[in-house]
Amino acid sequence: MANQKKKEMVHNFQQKFTDKMKSLGLHFKNIDLYQQAFSHSSFINDFNMNRLEHNERLEFLGDAVLELTVSRYLFDRHPHLPEGNLTKMRATIVCEPSLVIFANKIKLNELILLGKGEEKTGGRTRPSLISDAFEAFVGALYLDQGLDSVWTFAEKVIFPYVEDDELVGVVDFKTQFQEYVHSQNKGDVTYQLIKEEGPAHHRLFTSEVILENKAVAEGKGKTKKESEQKAAEQAYKLMKNKKSL
């Protein structure tokens, strides 16, 4: 009975996975490798499989491959940023909250093989489980198809959303805007808090970003830091839209 259930789950996974790869425009050779990438330890335990057949080793590899891929992207995209800033930006992209966003864009959690108990307790929507599966998939893709395929995947699933509104708080817009200013030799950037309002337990802060003694944009947030990020985001987007600052 258990073996039949396992066969059904694996067959269902293979069909869904094949369809998913087609939709992403990606090729694969070793489907067993990807099955391992999506096998949570609870699935392995339920069917008394070898404990090394779960996805944790591939997750370990995928984390390193993601760091390399994102490092190259940031290195090429931000030629004026020093190492410290690049490291900070990479850390905010290759982290659980952002990986969950990327995974959810393509509904990767639908592929995860879970044990009965883990499924019942909501494991399929658990952020840590989703981000782990995302990293494991990248590790499997690297082993099966190489770094070029990982880059192709990242171009479709990661890079387009790095500066998306949904990732505000993940992307450091203050750093992005500072880089633009540096590349244009436009002088120093400063931030000024111009308003605080609301009760103590629900404050709203408004900050403006100042470039060459001129306020160029403002933003609001629940903290001073968030309001500065919002102001920098507005200034950065004005720059991207080629409007004068």
UniProtKB/Swiss-Prot annotation:
Transmembrane stretches, start-end: none
Cofactor(s) needed for function: Mg(2+)
Subcellular compartments: Cytoplasm
Residue ranges annotated for the RNase III domain, each copy included: 17-146
Record's keyword annotation contains Ribosomal protein: no
Any single biological process term in GO: rRNA processing
Domain annotation DRBM: ranges: 172-241
Active site residues according to the UniProt entry: D63, E135
PANTHER family (alphabetical): RIBONUCLEASE 3, RIBONUCLEASE III
Complex and partners: Homodimer.
Protein name: Ribonuclease 3
Lineage: Bacteria, Bacillati, Bacillota, Bacilli, Bacillales
Gene: rnc
